[in-house]
Amino acid sequence: MVPILIGFFVFFFVFLISGMALLKERISGTLATPVKRSEIVYGYMLGYGLMALAQASLITVVGIKLLDIEIIGSIFSVIIIAVLLGFVALAFGILLSTFASSEFQMMQFIPLVVVPQIFFSGIIPLDSMADWAQRIGKILPLTYAGEALSAIIMQGAGLIDVGKDILVLMIFLVVLLILNILGLKR
């Protein structure tokens, strides 16, 4: 359960900060510039991506040291998965901020995103749940990050061994980037 909690905290904190930042700029009118929507999205992904990189790395290292977790695999692999999940959370936060018209409304999206991640991503074992609940889990990015983190931390898997999970997370990232570019309002 500890590996998926690392992923959960990375997802939650990056999602929260990224969504609020873009929304604040959109509401204040500072996005009304002649740049393309794709440039805004890529700029946010780059700028906040550096923050996501630092935050994911910090949460991972502090979580492992603070909880005295024994890692059978590579800590570098754990950080790679956490950072990739951080980028997915960043893109997801930006996407949801395009639908919000106020910070209060953005805060209302948080339970809609966080609660399913808690119940259906593997924090509570999916194999003990009904089929419909397991299907919901298969459409959540934290499920794949949790599986990869668990395999690396508890079984010593390498990045090649969790390639399917990495591929799914990358697909989530690309789809979310495309949706961000198409859906961004100024």
Language model segments and positions:
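Membrane-spanning alpha-helical segments of multipass transporters and channels
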Residues: 70-186
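Transmembrane alpha-helix boundary and packing residues in multipass membrane permease domains
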Residues: 16-20, 60, 64, 94, ...
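Transmembrane helix-boundary elements of multi-pass transport/secretion proteins
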Residues: 1-57, 65-75, 108, 154-186
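Residue-identity detector for threonine
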Residues: 30-33, 60, 98, 143
